[in-house]
Regions:
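Accessory, non-ATPase domains that flank or precede helicase/AAA+ motor cores in DNA-metabolism machines
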Residues: 1-75
Length: 75
C-alpha cells in the first residue's frame, strides 16, 4: 500500500496521511495538488508533501479522491 502526507488548508498543525488508490499510484508525486475528504462532510484540495509505504498506526486512512492538476507545483 502506498500513502501520501498531505498539507491541507485547515487551522491544524502538521500533515494528514491518506492512502493512494491503485489507479493513482504511478502518477502521485511531491508537490501535486490532490482532492481529499476531511472530516465527515468536507472536501479540500491539498498538496502532497511526501509519499511512503508506512501504514499509520491508530486510525484507518481515507483514500485520495483524485489528482487536481496534471503536473507538480513548484516550490
Amino acid at each position: 500500500m502506498k500513502y501520501a502526507d498531505i498539507l491541507l488548508p485547515v487551522p491544524l498543525e502538521g500533515f494528514f496521511t491518506y492512502a493512494v488508490p491503485e489507479r493513482l499510484r504511478e502518477q502521485i508525486a511531491f508537490g501535486m495538488r490532490v482532492l481529499v475528504n476531511f472530516g465527515p462532510k468536507k472536501t479540500y484540495i491539498g498538496i502532497v508533501v511526501r509519499t511512503h509505504d508506512e501504514e499509520p498506526k491508530g486510525y484507518k486512512t481515507k483514500d485520495i479522491i483524485d489528482i487536481a492538476d496534471s503536473k507538480k507545483q513548484d516550490r
